[in-house]
Design a protein with these regions (language model features):
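Acidic/polar-rich alpha-helix caps and helix-coil junctions
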Residues: 1-62, 66, 98-353
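Short, cationic low-complexity segments
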Residues: 62-94, 158-165
Length: 353
């Protein structure tokens, strides 16, 4: 797939899909629920543990401990507040009147946010603009339950809004009611939530990419709609005493639906945009998007347009440019030195370094 050998990749992905070993969970959130580790949607995950067989924080999920909110009023939750979702990502979860993503126009509509507003100041979240319900399982934002830790207070939990905006990540946060079982020493950031490297949802979206490239657009639509149907039918973030679960009112105007138009006859450019946008929404903050941009060969174009949009809020991006040579890291000089055969290196440095 990363070599753009779509026909060959399709054969392998079809084997996974028809194996019967995996399925989509009913609820999107359960993929990020420690109680659902190693569920039927997990294809490959990094295993972690606490409180068993002598496992302490050293065997816990350490990859996201710095990304927990900078929440001084919640010492069991608080972290360094890194890995903040961008304005652009949040805007991407807005949908049209049919519950479909606004792929080409989402950036023209700024979703209401509390940038530069103190937590002590009055502010209400947007309850009118329709948004994909996955937004509030992915992003922590003011006025919306931060799982069962209470309503997100806004700026008081943000390390530095000027540097990265008003949002926290939410995908890798355990529930407060899981502290005793799934956290080390009641410290949420040292937890036993496995990190999913590949989910079945991603397999389906990879397969959709392949179907587009080999000329089966309706099959691609089927796979994308499986993901969107789960988002529609699954749980939404709720307000009330049982938040984020229960039967309380929805925390936003959630709306999402499947594609009902025919994909046959649409250009490959349109089809690629639809599949790729779904991958962005479904897999946000799971560590794939940059590498997807690179393998789609659109990193330079996308990221420079992103910089233009995001710098409206984040001033340090002024003057920033993404160079195509930065798609790949430099090869360490020591490895180049070790590669010499008959006086000549078998490894050469990547361009731009």
């Amino acid at each position: 797939l990363f070599q753009q050998k779509y026909s060959e990749a399709k054969v392998l992905l079809d084997e996974v899909i028809t194996s019967g070993k995996y399925k989509l969970l009913d609820n999107y959130f359960d993929n990020f629920n420690a109680e659902q580790n190693n569920n039927a949607e997990v294809v490959w995950s990094n295993q972690v543990a606490v409180n068993v067989a002598g496992a302490g924080y050293d065997r816990s999920q350490r990859g996201f401990d710095l990304s927990y909110p900078n929440a001084p009023d919640q010492p069991n939750l608080s972290g360094a507040g890194f890995q903040q979702p961008t304005f652009d990502l949040v805007n991407a979860y807005q949908v049209d009147e049919n519950g479909l993503p606004m792929i080409d126009t989402y950036a023209d509509h700024e979703f209401k946010n509390d940038q530069d507003i103190e937590s002590s100041e009055a502010w209400e979240p947007d309850m009118e603009t329709p948004v994909d319900p996955r937004l509030d399982w992915v992003v922590g934002r003011r006025g919306v339950p931060y799982h069962d830790w209470g309503l997100h207070p806004g700026k008081a939990w943000i390390r530095d809004q000027v540097s990265a905006g008003p949002y926290n990540q939410k995908k890798w946060i355990i529930l407060e009611n899981q502290l005793a079982t799934y956290a080390y020493d009641n410290t949420a950031k040292f937890n036993a939530m496995n990190f999913n490297i590949i989910r079945y949802a991603q397999v389906l979206l990879w397969a959709a990419e392949c179907e587009v490239e080999v000329g089966n657009p309706e099959k691609a639509k089927e796979y994308v709609n499986m993901i969107r149907q789960r988002a529609k039918d699954g749980s939404y973030v709720r307000l009330g005493d049982e938040a984020p679960f229960g039967n309380g009112p929805a925390a936003a105007n959630y709306k999402v639906d499947i594609y009902k138009d025919s994909w046959a006859g649409l250009s490959k450019d349109v089809l690629r945009k639809r599949v790729r946008f779904e991958e962005r929404l479904e897999l946000a903050l799971e560590g794939h998007f940059f590498f997807d941009l690179v393998r789609w060969d659109i990193a330079e174009d996308f990221l420079n347009k992103y910089i233009e949009r995001e710098k409206r809020h984040i001033q340090y991006l002024n003057g920033a440019v993404f160079d195509k040579n930065h798609r790949y890291y430099a090869i360490p000089l020591t490895e180049i030195d070790r590669s010499y055969v008959d006086g000549k290196p078998t490894l050469t440095q990547n361009p731009g370094y």
